[in-house]
Amino acid sequence: RAKTIYVKSAEEMHRVSIREAAKCQLFIACAAVADYRPKQKLTKKVKKDSDFMDISLIKNPDIASDVSALCNKPFTVGFAAETQESNESLEKIAFEKLQRKKLDLIIANDISNGSIGFDSDYNSVVAIDEYSSEIFPRVRKTQLSRQLISKISQKIKIKNKEL
């Protein structure tokens, strides 16, 4: 059963995710949480006193990594929206992220491809676990979501047999 909880900040999302993940069999980290937040929270309007403003940023907690680090962790799925800025393949970048965050499965896509991903009804992704990868060619996002749920279900069944 899916559960939606509304939050207002990455920090609140982190707290709620850790609390709720401890009760789950599956945690899908699909929110595009900002990597950084302003160091200082302001409660008043910032005056336009000069032409420039410096804003200090600090790193937000990594929700997927922290869920994966739980003692009794759920099957944890992460997402990686990547841009191809180097010769490194999407699969290699995503696999490194899978290992670093200790995820069970990662779903990655190349957001520099304008015909898929953001601002498109279509997407193409690669699903990667510790032992294999599977490319999901360009289809409507609604169809892709069904394919990914099926893939995740298969992976959970395999993991449960191993236990």
Regions found by a protein language model. Give the residues of each.
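A cross-family phosphate/adenosyl-ligand binding-site feature
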Residues: 1-163
